[in-house]
């Protein structure tokens, strides 16, 4: 699969803005997140790959996730985007939450179709990350794309989150020693 080049402005801090090409997968302690938590019985159970300012996942929607006219619900597509975009700052040793996100829907997705969601950091200023994302279908058509601002966790929040989700404090999300 070809990586996206992340159309739009270039990152100001020299970070890459393309999507992962088979990055690092990190297994967290079970948790209840609807998108990536293994403990949520009705969740999506996404596995996130991380690489240099980017995050990605591949996922197949089953019929539980359809909306009108037997297409994957737009809210589920938004969740895919939100998840990979929020994970993209992880290579900067940051956990992030959505502050603002704008989505453009370009095409519909069918249940049973393999979807690839990718998010990448385009700009970083202190704890604020500008991130772009896209969901593509099995045929590489763009189904949805988004841009947003994400707020990184404070230093004390990072320590608590790493402990809660089973990541050693001295290790970043990509497995490199923290600075």
Describe each PLM feature range.
Residues 58-60, 102-104, 118-120, 134, ...:
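Residue-level recognition of well-ordered beta-strand positions that form the cores
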Residues 44, 97-99, 115, 129, ...:
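Hydrophobic core residues within well-ordered beta-strands of beta-rich domains
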Residues 49-51, 120-124:
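Short beta-strand micro-motifs enriched in acidic
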Residues 26-33, 114-116:
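Short Pro/Gly-enriched beta-strand edge/turn motifs at strand-loop
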Residues 1-24, 110-111, 122-179:
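HotDog/MaoC-like acyl-thioester-processing domains
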């Amino acid at each position: 699969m070809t990586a996206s080049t992340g159309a739009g402005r270039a990152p100001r801090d020299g970070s890459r803005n393309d999507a992962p090409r088979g990055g690092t997968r990190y297994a967290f302690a079970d948790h209840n997140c609807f998108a990536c938590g293994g403990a949520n019985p009705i969740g999506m159970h996404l596995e996130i790959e991380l690489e240099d300012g980017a995050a990605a996942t591949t996922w197949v929607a089953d019929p539980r996730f359809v909306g009108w006219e037997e297409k994957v619900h737009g809210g589920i597509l938004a969740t895919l985007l939100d998840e990979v975009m929020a994970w993209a700052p992880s290579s900067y040793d940051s956990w992030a939450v959505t502050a603002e996100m704008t989505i453009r829907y370009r095409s519909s997705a069918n249940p049973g179709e393999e979807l690839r969601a990718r998010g990448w950091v385009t700009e970083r200023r202190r704890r604020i990350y500008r991130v772009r994302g896209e969901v593509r279908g099995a045929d590489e058509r763009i189904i949805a794309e988004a841009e947003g601002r994400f707020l990184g966790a404070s230093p004390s929040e990072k320590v608590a989150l790493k402990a809660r989700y089973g990541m050693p404090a001295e290790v970043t999300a990509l497995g490199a020693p923290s600075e």
